[in-house]
Amino acid sequence: MRRIQRLVACVMVAGAGALGSAMAAAVPPTIFAAASLEPALDQMAHEGALGTPAPRLVYAASSALARQIENGAPADLFISADERWMDDVARHDAIVPSTRIDLLGNALVLIAPPHSMSKVQIGQGPAPWLEALGREGHLAVALPDSVPAGIYAKQSLTKLGMWQVLQPRMAMTRDVRAALNFVVLGQCPLGIVYRSDAVSEPRVKVLATFPAASHKPIVYPAAIVKGHDDDATRALLAALQAERARGVFRRWGFDVLAH
């Protein structure tokens, strides 16, 4: 009887181990991605372009995601909206350097509500901007000291000689999607966002595109988080570079860099 009990116990332990392994294998990878990637990645996940089961997608400003990863957040893959925050994570030895790629590019645009009569153009000086803002309006911009879209916006406006004049009229947001929503909801008559954000939202129109030379290149690097370099995560990184994903990224207004 004792021998039978021991045998049953062994079978139960083995079965539990196999079940645990199967459950672990079924847990999808987690992507920490810049907020501007939400429409494109959501579409890919919905369509199965990123594998089955679809990965868990966590969106926020790149700065916030980088700090979470550095503090041990359970991310498998990180996609930043600029090189600065990927470099920061790398300095904290939190990514696998050999897996880092430049995945995407983007452009910076000035947006307004679709009914706006504003004729603001880049390079005309601040007067048309102030006229479009009116007495109490604000320019929606992501936080310029930490959020990539805000950093690029500050670089451009500084290069164009308008930062000092426009800064007091800015409504600064936690991420670029929040800046987009300020314009969508009519809370701001103007906003600076990525081209991909404008493509994703029919309730805004693009007034102008900032010259690429007015800011550092907009690059979205991707890398596997240290301790999460497994077959599933590598397959996910490969899926993001596949032709199917490339087509989705292009439709949402991104430039595809990775081959």
Give the ranges of each region predicted by the language model.
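Exported/periplasmic ABC-transporter solute-binding proteins
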Residues: 23-73, 82-83, 87-259
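N-terminal twin-arginine translocation
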Residues: 2, 19-22
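Short N-terminal or domain-adjacent regulatory/targeting segments
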Residues: 2-3, 14, 117-121
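Short active-site segment of divalent metal-dependent hydrolases/proteases
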Residues: 79
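Twin-arginine (Tat) signal peptide motif
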Residues: 1-9
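Bacterial N-terminal signal peptides
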Residues: 8-20
